[in-house]
Structures are given as C-alpha cells and as structure tokens.
Swiss-Prot record:
One of its GO terms (cellular component) is protein-containing complex. Keywords: Cytoplasm, Metal-binding, Nucleus, Repeat, Zinc, Zinc-finger. Disulfide bonds: none annotated. This is PHD and RING finger domain-containing protein C126.07c. GO terms for biological process: chromatin remodeling. Residues 346-356 have a biased composition (Basic residues). Residues 305-324, 359-377 have a biased composition (Polar residues). PANTHER family: PHD AND RING FINGER DOMAIN-CONTAINING PROTEIN 1 (PTHR12618:SF20).
Length: 571
C-alpha cells in the first residue's frame, strides 16, 4: 500500500526530453522530482515546470511552449498546427488546465525594406568583363555600355563624345539609309514626307536597340556577381565562424533529437509472417505415401547391405585373392563333400549362371569375372546411393558420392582387365592407372582435411574426374582464405559536398580562363585533378567542412590552382 501511495521517482535517464530547452521533463509529481537539471528560468515557478501537451501527442515544458506560441502555433517536432494546449502535472499525469493559442502568420522580417542590388550599379567592360581600371573605363553616350580604352586599342580617353562600335555601326547604317532615301525623294514632294517618317522609325528602332542592350548588360553584371560570390562568402564565414560555434552546436543537437523522435514515432510495426500450409488433393497425398514407402524400402535394403558388408569384409589388396571361377568350384566342392549340409542349406545357396560356351578360355573367364564384379559393384553402389539420398544434400555428401562412383567404375574395369586377353577393352580403359590403396565409400570417412588428398589421388591420367567438384573446392578455399582481405572501410564524399567543391574550383579557375592563360582542355584537366585531390583529403580527414576548418578548403584550392598555373608557365 505504501508503494502505491508514494511512487518512487523514475530514473532521469529514462525520462523524456524537452526539444526546446533540451532538459528532462518531470515524469513524477513535482515535489518528488529533482529540478536541478532544469534551467533556473523554468524551475522558478511551478507553472513553468508543468507539462504542456499539444494534440499531436508531444510534451514540452509549459514555460518553453508559451514562449514558442508567441511566434508560431505549430509543433516544434512535427510542424502540426494546434489551437489548444493542455497543461499536466507531469508526463502522462493528471490534467491541470488548458488555454487557447492564437493562429500565427509567418512574415518576412525585412519585407518592407526595398532591396538594393549593388551588383547592378557595377559597370563592367563588355569585352573583358572586368570592372577594374575605372580611370580608363569609358561609357557609351548612346547605349551606356562600358569599354576599356585598351580593349578598343585607344591610346587615351577621348575629350568629345564617345560612341561604342555597336552604336557607330547603327548610326552608319541609318545615315546610309537616309542618304539613299533622300536622293530618291528629290523627285517629288511626296517622297520627302516618307523619308521623314522612315527617319523617325529608324530612330525609334535605335532607341529600342539601346534599351535592350542596357537590359542585357544589367543581367550580365548580376550573373557575374552571382558566380563569383562563393569565395567572398567563405571569407565572410571565416570572420563570423568562431562566434557561432555555440549556437550552431545547440541547433544541431535540436535537429538530431527531433530526427530521432520522428523516426521512433514513424517506425512501422512489424507484423508476424503468416505461413500458408499447401493444400493437397487425394492423388498428391497418395503419391507422397508411395514415396515414403519407397524410402522405407530403400532404408531396409541399405541396412541389409551394411550387415552383409560387416559380416563379409573385403579382403585386403596385399593378400592372395582367388578368381571368381576358383571360388565357384570351391563352393561346389564344399557343398558336395560336406556331409552335414542339409537340403535347406543347398536351397539357400546362391545359384550360378551357366556360362556361354566360347572357343577361347580367356574370354569365358573374363565374362564370369565381369558378371561377378558387376554384381558386387551394383550392391555397393546401390548402398552408397541410398545413403546419399537419406543424408542431407551438402557439398561434402556430393563429394563423397562422386568419389564412390569413381571408385566403383574404376574397380569394375580394373578387375575386368585382370584376364589374359585384352580384346574387349576399349582404349580409354586400357590406359587406366592402378587404383589407390584406400578410397572411402561413405561420406563420413571423408573430412575437410583429407578431401584434397583424395581428389589428387583420383585425378590421375586415364580417370574420369568431375571438374565441377574440383573447381567448387578450389573456389571455396580461395573464398575463405581471402574473405578478410575484402573488408574495406572508406569514407565516401556526399554529392552535396562534391558539388560545393566543384563550384569553388570553377570559381578559382575562371579568371585564368577569361584571361586566356589556359585553354578549355586545360581548364577541364585542372578542374578534375584538383577536385579529386580535395575529395581524397576529405576522405582521409585532412580537410573537413565541419567546424572552423571550412576556410582551409578555399585556401587549399587557391594554392592548387596557382601551382597548376605556375607549372603550366614553367613548361
């Protein structure tokens, strides 16, 4: 009962955080909560420490949200508009009061102030595009275009009126047209009126041409200032950057906290996967039952073959082995001479096949030998095949199956080649090399250590080896040996960073290109090399766009551009 009446204060680490002041929110009654981590401006009053809840479900300090509502009525986290605020005692605590919020309209701070474009007042030479050397910068009296005296090959500033080449050309064409029309209008009085109208029309067209020229000059000056504003912007940032470290760090923390909270709220709930049981009809069910019966029969055959192999082990290769014909005669003699043998034993004796009469004795012996060896190989091959079916299909089982298959093929042909005549042998099996001393017939006898040894033994001249088996084994060894060498941790440069670096390099190279110090191909080559070197420095951590090290990038780029120009001049 005491535990229910006096709840213990929760751990401050598990409490929520106010996104506005970045301090913990009380998750228990205020008299039991430690307010030392809250700023003094908030903890001075109980109403400021209370929790303000908005309709979107986010919690803030009431004091912080009141200050926020003076500017905007949107949630600081999800930007949802709200017109009402509920005040609680603590997070998920009892309701205390509520108050309305007025709808706020955001406005631009300097909307009433006129915008002054300083770049439009700058006069630049139409030919070279520069505004320096103002003492020799001439303004045309007709179209207000600016020209340097050295750009027009003039020795000094003219005292009388100055007209640009464009205006001179227009005036010449106008005078020529007027003179031709005046000469033609001398024939009559009516023609003179037409010449006056044509002259007025030409003057109007000339004025319109000059107006368009002024407009294009203003646009050109604005574009020039916009393209060359990056370097000056970084120079201004270099002076103001140390004073903004604290505020930028606080803003970064707020943005990161808001992002984490939004990810937690928008995290999708994983639904359990529904496993559908396949529906089978009567014919499919009967087929599966037949398949199970066949597998059961194969397992019984495998057990019988295993017992026979254990009771009658194969003699070693070092001992003397009898031929199948001698074994057959010995069994017949034993059953005939043994007085204790019964009729039941004679009925259980394995019947022998009658030999086909042949003129050659060796051919008959080889035929009997082939029959016996084929029966033995069929039994052992069937046993190994059933064991491979019962066991799971892995690379090790496939390897043992290929080894056993190779052994059985080689064993049958090697026994068949022991006869006196080689008439029935093909050239492929006549070149077979002697079989190894021991080849494992079961997948359990083959391990990862001696797998390569067996592959080497079986891959002798004249044998059939599965090339896919050898390739898979070598590929697996190379894959496991070089697995740790493929780990490569490299910091990639983002697309926005590359775009900013490329703009800085372009701005640094443009003056040299306009002065015809470098060609178009050299401009592209220097731009690519400098950008790649800066990308490498950013990846290595030598340069950085964060903190007070931003101004180093523009300085480094200017130095690299100067070095490239100097190397070009030296060459």
């Amino acid at each position: 009962m005491n535990a229910e009446e006096d709840p213990k204060p929760a751990d401050s680490d598990s409490s929520e955080e106010c996104i506005i002041c970045l301090s913990n929110l009380p998750n228990c009654p205020l008299d039991q909560w430690d307010s030392s981590s809250v700023p003094a401006s908030i903890s001075s009053t109980l109403d400021g420490l209370r929790i303000a809840k908005i309709p979107c479900g986010h919690y803030f300090h009431n004091h912080c949200l009141e200050s926020w509502c003076r500017v905007a009525n949107t949630c600081p986290l999800c930007r949802t508009e709200f017109l009402k605020v509920d005040v609680l005692e603590f997070v998920k605590g009892p309701w205390y009061r509520a108050y309305p919020v007025e709808e706020k309209t955001q406005s631009v701070a300097n909307a009433g102030e006129p915008f002054e474009d300083e770049g439009s007042e700058t006069c630049r030479c139409v030919i070279c595009g520069r505004s320096d050397h103002a003492e020799v910068l001439l303004l045309c009296d007709g179209c207000d275009d600016a020209y340097h005296t050295y750009c027009l090959n003039m020795d000094a500033v003219p005292i009388e009126e100055f007209y640009c080449p464009n205006c001179v050309l227009l005036n010449y064409q106008e005078n020529e047209t007027l003179s031709s029309r005046i000469s033609l209008s001398r024939r009559g009085q009516t023609r003179r009126r037409r010449v006056g109208a044509a002259a007025r029309a030409s003057r109007v067209s000339q004025q319109q041409q000059r107006a368009w020229t002024r407009a294009w000059n203003a646009i050109r000056n604005r574009a020039w200032d916009a393209l060359n504003s990056d370097l000056s912007y970084y120079g201004m940032q270099q002076e103001r950057l140390p004073a903004r470290d604290v505020s930028s760090e606080l803003l970064r923390r707020r943005i990161e906290s808001a992002r984490l909270r939004s990810n937690q709220l928008n995290e999708p709930v994983e639904q359990p996967r529904v496993v559908q049981t396949p529906v089978t009809n009567a014919s499919e069910q009967q087929a599966w039952n037949d398949f199970d019966e066949i597998l059961h029969a194969n397992s019984s055959v495998h057990s019988v073959a295993t017992e026979a192999t254990i009771s009658n082990p194969r003699p070693s290769s070092g001992r003397f082995q009898q031929t199948p014909i001698e074994e057959h005669h010995q069994q017949d003699t034993r059953f005939v001479n043994d007085p204790n043998s019964t009729s039941h034993d004679r009925r259980q004796k394995r019947p022998t096949r009658r030999h086909i009469p042949c003129s050659n004795k060796s051919s008959g012996s080889s035929t009997v030998l082939g029959n016996n060896s084929s029966s033995k190989s069929e039994n052992s091959f069937l046993a190994s095949l059933i064991s491979n079916i019962n066991q799971p299909s892995t690379s090790r089982i496939d390897t043992s199956f290929m080894l056993s298959l190779q052994h059985e093929i080689k064993n049958s042909h090697s026994e068949a080649s022991d006869g006196t005549s080689d008439v029935h042998l093909t050239p492929l099996f006549s070149n077979l090399s002697p079989r190894p001393s021991h080849v494992p017939l079961s997948p359990r006898e083959i391990s990862n250590d001696n797998l390569d040894d067996h592959l080497i033994e079986l891959s002798e001249p004249g044998e059939i080896v599965d090339n896919h088996l050898v390739n898979d084994t070598s590929m697996h060894q190379r894959r496991t040996s070089g697995r740790h060498d493929l780990v490569h941790s490299s910091k990639k440069v983002s697309y926005e960073t590359k775009y900013r670096i490329e703009r800085l390099v372009n701005a640094a190279l443009k003056p040299y290109y306009r002065e015809a110090k470098i060609s178009k191909d050299q401009f592209a080559l220097f731009n690519k090399n400098i950008c790649r070197s800066v990308y490498t420095a950013l990846s290595d951590g030598t340069l950085s766009l964060e903190g007070p090290q931003q101004h180093k990038i523009s300085k480094t780029i200017r130095e690299k551009v100067v070095n490239c120009i100097q190397s070009l001049s030296n060459d």
